[in-house]
Amino acid sequence: MASAHIEHKLSLLPDLPGCYLMKNLNSQIIYVGKAKNLKNRVRSYFKSSHTGKTARLVSEIADFEFIVTSTDKEAFLLEITLIQKHQPYFNIKLKKGTGYPYIKITNERDPQILIVSDVRKDGGYYFGPYPNVYAAQETVNFIQKVYPLRRCHGFQKRPCLYYHMGQCLGACFKTVPVAEYDAQIKRIKSFLNGHVETVKKQLTKRMDQAAADLEFERAAELRDQLNYIEMTVEKQKIISNDNTPRDLFNFYLDKGWLSIQVFFIRQARLMKREKRLFPVVSTAPEEMTSFILQFYNRKNNVLPREVLVPNGLDKQVLSDILGIPVRTPQRGQKKDLLDMAQKNARIVLEEKFRLLELDERKTTGAMQEITDALGIPAGHKIEAFDHSHIQGADLVSAMVVFTDGQPNKKLYRKYKLRTVDHADEAASTREVIRRRYTRLLKEHAALPDLILMDGGEIQLEAAKDVLENELGIATPVAAMVKNDHHKTADLLASAGDQHLHLDPKSQGFYLLQRIQDEVHRFAITFHRQVHTKHSLSSRLDEIPGVGPKTRNKLLRKFGSMSKIAGASLEEIQSLGIAKNVAQTVKFSLAGGGVTPKHYQKGAT
């Protein structure tokens, strides 16, 4: 079942094509996919049952984001770029491959046209990448027939087979003029950049003639050639027609918030996207100009050869300061990319507003529900306490702080109890409450609006007694009560009181659960640390010849009994520990029990 966070993000998905990026709990991208309809595709992961690898993927998804494109093909091309960049774990098939192919015209005296898997800085002309590998290969075959270059291995004193077939200019047996190659390359570049109408008309005419002559196989071949040209030479927004490194900025402004999208186009591909959201004071053009200048002032941002921005920005100022052309495209491929960036900026901002509304209900709204239920003034800050021990040993307390419904971990505190040496909930509560709020009074620090105790009447009454009768503090206190399954059940305002019966489906109840789970987790974690350290110290203290200084040296260096036991005699002695003591430590931790005679001091 999807988390509440995922559910709300699913409701924000648009009915548009694009790519989605699935993330795990560590915010690592674990899967990249594409969709004709983002809303339907992404929702299908969480609304349908799955098996095998898909089930494993869904179980690890903690969050996702998406990028909107204009067509399904753009999503295809963007998908491979994102996979190559992030190498997601679950994209195994695409990860192991070399990606979609490119069509390349080589930079040689006698150039060739080839299918290649990557782009190199070798002076060649690259076109692509192309999602349909077979269509790209067939298009190259077509070009080799219509616009031949060199198709053989080079000079071999006699014409090759391809020359006789009209698919090679003859570098195999003669010197082909550079001008002839240049003219042919110009035609190929024009063809691959989309100027295909003349060729398509010729093919269509030949296809119709073949059909009229009842040469149906030949007509089918010509029809397929037309389809391959459509698939490979079709205009693309994600892929530009040149390899100029450029960055593209666009924005969307609403309700005092500015949403910015930055597209990084490298090697004719959208290599990276950054998105930013912040409230603004000045006008959008002023904020954008300032943002762009600060953006390139960062250490890791390298200037491209060109920057594209929307209308309204002072391009001359930007260009003068950055030292590169800053332009606003008015039509064509670059303008379409700029529009796509603005569309994504708008979608991100709309999502932000919906999440803000949701967060307000979850945080400040939830806080309001709790204070209303207790009948106390609305507040912002809650401090919650819990104790932890094992059969009365290593007693500790912990405090967590929630501000406007959000954990404020910088204010968390840990307490080793000093006056309690056995399991006594009331005494533990008195000590930690006394220590915490005596200090706040002494420092003239702000008191919380509500104090919550994890427990029941015992903890509640002990806390109230210290606050009211010893410290004169009137801060409201309540106890977070658990049910028989050790789950959050309700709030208790005073001893003998009826439970408040918060609605289990309310945001206030969910906040109470989060606070109780967090303070319990924090206390348990601290107790384990203390108990582990004490266990190590106690066992070392039992070894003859090991005093506090030696014990501390060993713990600081090795950290655990297993590592001390696994250390060599020389490693232990390197800490300034005498050889006979080091031998005793080694023997004792190896399970030897009483130190043998030959390990006693003075033995040889």
UniProtKB/Swiss-Prot annotation:
GO molecular function: DNA binding; excinuclease ABC activity
Assembly behavior: Interacts with UvrB in an incision complex.
Originating gene: uvrC
Residue intervals of the GIY-YIG domain: 15-92
Keyword tags: Cytoplasm, DNA damage, DNA excision, DNA repair, Excision nuclease, SOS response
Protein family according to the UniProt entry: Belongs to the UvrC family.
Superkingdom field: Bacteria
Residue span(s) of domain UVR: 197-232
Principal subcellular localisation of the protein: cytoplasm
Species this protein is from: Lactiplantibacillus plantarum (strain ATCC BAA-793 / NCIMB 8826 / WCFS1)
This protein's GO CC annotations: cytoplasm; excinuclease repair complex
Protein localization: Cytoplasm
Name listed for the protein in its UniProt record: UvrABC system protein C
Record's function text: The UvrABC repair system catalyzes the recognition and processing of DNA lesions. UvrC both incises the 5' and 3' sides of the lesion. The N-terminal half is responsible for the 3' incision and the C-terminal half is responsible for the 5' incision.
Pfam families the UniProt entry points to: GIY-YIG, HHH_5, UVR, UvrC_RNaseH, UvrC_RNaseH_dom
Biological processes annotated in GO: nucleotide-excision repair; SOS response
The keyword DNA repair is annotated on this UniProt entry: yes
InterPro entries: GIY-YIG_endonuc, GIY-YIG_endonuc_sf, GIY-YIG_UvrC_Cho, RuvA_2-like, UVR_dom, UVR_dom_sf, UvrABC_protein_C, UvrC
